[in-house]
Amino acid sequence: MLKPSINELLTVVDSRYSLVVATAKRARQIIDGAKIKVDSDSNKPVSTAAKEIYEGKVTYIKTDEDER
């Protein structure tokens, strides 16, 4: 089960779509060797990325392409 929960994550991100895209991109960065910005018990990059987003350690920028 994902911690923080989807509902908790949606309080810091404006939509489910943005949440999925931001989490996936950050997880890919972690897989590729990016420094992890939170203490995490999980060795799963998606869980770590979600925790980083929830704690505000990682942000995303909405572009014009996102509005299509």
From Swiss-Prot:
Is Transferase one of the keywords? yes
Q: Which gene encodes it?
A: rpoZ
InterPro entries for this protein:
DNA-dir_RNA_pol_omega, Pol_omega/Rpo6/RPB6, RPB6/omega-like_sf
Free-text function comment from the UniProt entry:
Promotes RNA polymerase assembly. Latches the N- and C-terminal regions of the beta' subunit thereby facilitating its interaction with the beta and alpha subunits.
Q: Name one GO molecular function term.
A: DNA-directed RNA polymerase activity
Subunit structure, per the record?
A: The RNAP catalytic core consists of 2 alpha, 1 beta, 1 beta' and 1 omega subunit. When a sigma factor is associated with the core the holoenzyme is formed, which can initiate transcription.
- Which organism's genome codes for this protein? Alkaliphilus metalliredigens (strain QYMF)
Which cellular component appears as one GO term in the record? Answer: DNA-directed RNA polymerase complex
BP-aspect Gene Ontology terms: DNA-templated transcription
By what name is this protein known?
DNA-directed RNA polymerase subunit omega
Coiled-coil stretches noted in the UniProt entry, renumbered to this chain: none
